[in-house]
Amino acid sequence: MSMQSKSAAGRLAGKVAVITGGATGIGRATALAFAREGAKVSIFDIQIEEGFETVDLIRKAGGEAEFFQADLTKADEIDRAFDGSIAAFGPYNVLFNHAGTIIVKPLHETTEEDYDWLMDVNVKSAFLVCRRAVREMSENGGGSIVITSSIAAELGYALESVYCMSKGAVLQLARTISTEYRDAGIRCNAVCPGFVETAHGLKEIAELDAAGQEWEVSGMAATQGRICYPEEVAAAVVFLASDEASFVNGNATYVDNGWYAKG
């Protein structure tokens, strides 16, 4: 059965979705899930080959998708990507702001250049993307925004000081959008994963283990039980983006198998 026929009455049928950082990992899994549920999907990412691969996967399954290469730390490139998406699919009413990265390094060894780069990719990009999105969603009847934060927004982790800062910042961005734009019909929530089986997540675990921590086996068992799969995060994002979550606003959704609750 094609993706189109399966998703004729899908949970996101009739919606137009933009995903930043949608070329790989959680972003790719969510792009595929959005399309499977009936959304038209625009992917914004700096990774060109991987972005087109994701679009190809969606189209081969019968969905509709476009890729727009963009450095999401630059407002002019973001604007070009949004303009291209609107030209292709019309006004969007779902945004999954997922683009991000990580640095694993002791605070005393973290350079100003490290700080600027990580905050630009994780925080400035979210500010620029959401600034454009709330304006257009307000003009077009509202929509749903989901921002990828992390349990690192709430819990402090050694060797990830700037990463934790950045994820706390975007969690607060989600919360403030939810209050400021609620009456414009915009919902905004954050998804907060633990460790996820992506290139990003596995690199993080390897770097932490190399620094003397024990996340790969014992640490994982003690905190979240096992590693999370990107499709499990995507399922949470689909719910938050859908009309099923019509009264869910300003929420931090932990996809961590109880890690944050356990503390």
Give residue ranges: language-model regions.
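Residue(s) in the substrate-gating loop at a strand-loop-helix junction
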Residues: S150
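A conserved structural motif in NAD(P)-dependent oxidoreductases
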Residues: A222-V233, E244
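Active-site loop immediately N-terminal to the catalytic Tyr-X3-Lys motif
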Residues: H108, L155-S161, D183-A184, G225, ...
